[in-house]
Structures are given as structure tokens and as C-alpha cells.
């Protein structure tokens, strides 16, 4: 099955909730590293990719469309251009694998969806993308399930640790350090002085070498 992946990406000042531990230049580099992991998984699954960017950006392994409207409007514009099944996948889920994506696209349903933590949506696969409209932010998983019902779509909900792990907060970085072997995002964090640490209650978190943080 031929299908196309749509990856929203913010190349300028992304991931502001990581500002407590990464400056803007570092956050931009880290976001690019996570994007590389996602694109690698997409390509290995046999899919071509288009980046839906808020600012000018170039990538040798993906098409780029720059859209200045809000996220949902930009995604829905893109879905209207597709004449084949489509995958909407966020650029901040670096643990995703090609096998995970294949699991999504092999669904017998009209749509498969991976919920994110806190009610969000990390990935949607649509056999008929032009019939669907995206509604991200807030409890988007519930919104997307409602929209699928309105479209008359059958839906498979896929529960996956790797695909549901999006990176937004400092506490999320530990998942990359533990589970991200071979990923560009883990390499970036390690090269930036991050490592696994235990707090006084024995909970797992991350710490950063003060020397690296000062560079």
C-alpha cells in the first residue's frame, strides 16, 4: 500500500516547555534530532514524507510545505491535497519504529489512531484523508474519535508505549535516555551532557553536566 506521511514541524523556537533545561538554539537542534528519528522510521516503513513547517526549512529526505495558519488549518489543507492514504505523525515521538508504523497501516479499519498522554493524539492513519478534519489541542483524542464517527469511519485504537511517548517536558527526556538506543535524539542529549539520575525518593529523572549546560 502506498501512503504519505504528514509531519507537522516547528523549526523556530520549538518545545518551549524545555526552556528550563535547553536554550532556544539547543531546543531547535534537539527538535531536529527528534525529527530525524521520526523521518527514519517513516522511510523504513515504505512511506514518503512531507513536513508541514511554520517557517522556511529544508530536508533532503522529505518534501516541505510552509504554512503560516494555525496547526489544524494547515493539516486540513494538506489532507485535502492527498489522493492516497495518509499518516499524520507528530515530530516529537522519537521512539517510534518502522514496525510501529506498519502496525498502523495494516489496520482493517478505515482509520487507526494512537492516543498520546493527557488526552492528546500522536498518530492518525487515514485511508480516506480527504473525508477527515484534524482537531488538535486539548482532548484531541476524543475529538478525533468523534470526528471519525461523524465521517462513518471504523476505527482501531492502538496502544503503544513508543508511539504514545511524546517529548514535551524535562521529565520526558528520561524515556529517550532509557529506550532510545541508536536514536539521533538520544545521541544529542548524551552529547549535551544529559544522563539518568535518581532523586532523593528514588525516582528516575535526568541531570545535566553543569559544564555542558554552560557551553
UniProtKB/Swiss-Prot annotation:
Catalysed conversion reaction: (2S)-2-phospholactate + GTP + H(+) = (2S)-lactyl-2-diphospho-5'-guanosine + diphosphate
GO biological process, one term: F420-0 metabolic process
Gene3D superfamilies: 6.10.140.50, Spore Coat Polysaccharide Biosynthesis Protein SpsA, Chain A (3.90.550.10)
Domain of life: Archaea
InterPro entries: CofC, Nucleotide-diphossugar_trans
Keyword vocabulary terms for this entry: GTP-binding, Nucleotide-binding, Nucleotidyltransferase, Transferase
MF (Gene Ontology): GTP binding; phospholactate guanylyltransferase activity
EC number: 2.7.7.68
Pathway: Cofactor biosynthesis; coenzyme F420 biosynthesis
Short name of any one Pfam family annotated for the protein: CofC
SUPFAM superfamilies the UniProt entry points to: Nucleotide-diphospho-sugar transferases
Enzyme class, broadest EC rank: transferase
PANTHER family: 2-PHOSPHO-L-LACTATE GUANYLYLTRANSFERASE
Assembly with partners or alone: Homodimer.
Task of the protein: Guanylyltransferase that catalyzes the activation of (2S)-2-phospholactate (2-PL) as (2S)-lactyl-2-diphospho-5'-guanosine, via the condensation of 2-PL with GTP. It is involved in the biosynthesis of coenzyme F420, a hydride carrier cofactor.
Family: Belongs to the CofC family.
NCBIfam families: F420_cofC
HAMAP family: CofC (MF_02114)
Protein name: 2-phospho-L-lactate guanylyltransferase
Organism: Methanoculleus marisnigri (strain ATCC 35101 / DSM 1498 / JR1)
Amino acid at each position: 500500500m502506498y501512503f504519505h506521511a504528514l509531519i507537522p514541524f516547528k523549526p523556530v523556537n520549538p518545545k518551549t516547555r524545555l526552556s528550563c533545561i535547553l536554550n532556544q538554539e539547543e531546543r531547535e537542534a534537539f527538535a531536529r534530532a527528534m525529527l530525524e528519528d521520526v523521518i527514519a522510521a517513516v522511510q523504513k516503513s515504505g512511506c514518503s514524507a512531507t513536513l508541514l513547517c511554520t517557517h522556511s526549512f529544508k530536508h533532503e529526505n522529505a518534501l516541505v510545505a510552509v504554512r503560516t495558519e494555525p496547526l489544524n488549518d494547515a493539516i486540513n489543507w494538506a489532507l485535502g491535497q492527498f489522493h492516497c492514504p495518509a499518516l499524520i505523525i507528530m515530530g516529537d515521538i522519537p521512539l517510534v519504529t518502522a514496525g510501529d508504523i506498519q502496525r498502523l497501516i495494516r489496520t482493517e479499519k478505515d482509520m487507526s489512531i494512537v492516543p498520546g498522554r493527557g488526552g492528546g493524539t500522536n498518530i492518525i492513519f487515514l485511508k480516506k484523508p480527504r473525508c477527515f478534519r484534524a482537531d488538535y489541542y486539548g482532548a484531541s483524542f476524543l475529538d478525533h474519535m468523534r470526528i471519525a464517527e461523524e465521517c462513518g469511519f471504523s476505527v482501531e485504537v492502538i496502544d503503544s508505549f513508543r508511539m504514545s511517548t511524546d517529548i514535551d517536558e524535562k521529565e520526558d527526556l528520561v524515556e529517550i535516555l532509557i529506550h532510545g538506543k541508536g536514536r539521533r535524539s538520544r545521541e544529542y542529549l548524551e552529547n549535551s551532557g544529559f544522563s539518568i539520575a535518581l532523586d532523593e525518593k528514588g525516582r528516575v529523572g535526568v541531570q545535566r553536566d553543569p559544564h555542558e549546560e554552560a557551553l
